[in-house]
Regions:
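DNA major-groove recognition helix of helix-turn-helix
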Residues: 34, 45, 49, 59, ...
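A short, Lys/Arg-rich alpha-helix, primarily the initiator
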Residues: 1-22
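Alpha-helical residues within the helix-turn-helix
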Residues: 21, 32, 65
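DNA major-groove recognition helix of helix-turn-helix/homeodomain DNA-binding modules
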Residues: 52, 56-73
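Short alpha-helical DNA-recognition segment
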Residues: 24-47
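Interfacial/linker helices and their anchor residues that mediate assembly or domain coupling
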Residues: 79-117
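Residue-level signal for the short linker/turn that defines the boundary of a DNA-recognition helix
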Residues: 14, 24-25, 40, 55-58
């Protein structure tokens, strides 16, 4: 298995667990809310959170919807990017477009230079 696959699984696992806990849901509650069988719901979510198994895209999308977070949040590779995705996700589509335009304008004013931490 490639390192990037392991990293992506680990990121998804960490963000899933944090979002589920923030939502106040048990693993079983989350699993059943996304259509997993009641008998295996907790085990499946636990395996996703432990990074043992990958959720397929359709399941990951249902999980994100159930948790009220954008799908991209679950895969964001930095905390800052994850926070930005969550924040943008709270805005209406028109507000999202304006926020992105504002960010692009700020970047253009800075001459396209970006500081990396």
């Amino acid at each position: 298995m490639a390192q990037t696959e392991v990293d992506a699984r680990s990121i998804f696992a960490q963000r899933l667990k944090a979002a589920r806990e923030d939502a106040g849901l048990t693993q079983k509650e989350l699993g059943t809310s996304v259509g997993l069988p009641q008998e295996t719901a907790a085990v499946r979510i636990n395996r996703y959170e432990k990074g043992v198994h990958d959720a397929d895209l359709a399941t990951a999308r249902r999980i994100a919807q159930s948790l009220g977070v954008p799908l991209a949040f679950l895969y964001a590779d930095t905390d800052v990017l994850a926070e930005a995705i969550l924040t943008l996700g709270l805005l209406s589509k028109s507000e999202q477009r304006k926020a992105v335009a504002d960010l692009k304008a700020r970047l253009a004013q800075a001459g396209g230079a970006v500081e990396k931490d």
